[in-house]
């Protein structure tokens, strides 16, 4: 496979910086699943719906017939309006609140049950990467923030959604938690994030066993080096700033070294993350629970 590396940085704009890997897309062609309607007449909650993963997942669920409730700390009204316009026969709601607030999570899950009497799907995806620092320099405040969002918040959402899935008729549902390869590989300078994502993996396995009697499946994904987008850009920038892993402070060179760690010699794309998520949320994976899918290009 021919790999053509292009690294372009737009100065002083972290969210727009682009350290991109172009590759022969013929090796990565996707089957068109737009007409499969795997989620027709189902209801889903997507947390972190403003992020790359959350937004794309919401769009793909809607494309396959699902009604979607969007949860995020920031407003998702624009996404909701776009989905309503494109899929007028489905229902879409935008709920803006902090998943770390237990009372708010309970309130919004109860609203869903009182209005729709069902909830089939949860993409438990909201998260926070935190600082990129050596353990001895890492602040307690940021460590706590990472744990509050990635572990406590994710747990509260999982528990409350599972309660709906348990009491609805018929019982059951599918949940996918967003973990990370960081929770498996334990990278340096990411003590809070990596620890939190290791917790998410264990949470997934335990919840899958606890919830199986109610026909609720719980799985997780562990992505690594996914782009383009804010998270890829931020990771490259912070790796370069730290300088301790790749021994270089040039983001372009750091990006090249990061890609060289991947056996497939490229980063993954957002659709390559969400396709497995959709599989785990669908009836195609009806006998799969407690499983984590590594989406890493072979790392």
Question: Where are each of the predicted segments found?
Answer:
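Active-site loop immediately N-terminal to the catalytic Tyr-X3-Lys motif
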Residues: 136, 185-191, 213, 265, ...
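C-terminal substrate-recognition "lid" of short-chain dehydrogenase/reductases
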Residues: 264-295
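Short, small/polar-rich loop/turn modules that mediate ligand/substrate recognition or access, typified
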Residues: 212-217, 288-290
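Substrate-binding pocket helix/loop in short-chain dehydrogenase/reductase
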Residues: 133-135, 139-144, 258
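Residue(s) in the substrate-gating loop at a strand-loop-helix junction
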Residues: 180
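Active-site helix of classical SDR
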Residues: 158, 196, 204
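Canonical Rossmann dinucleotide-binding motif of NAD(H)/NADP(H)-dependent dehydrogenases/reductases
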Residues: 34-69
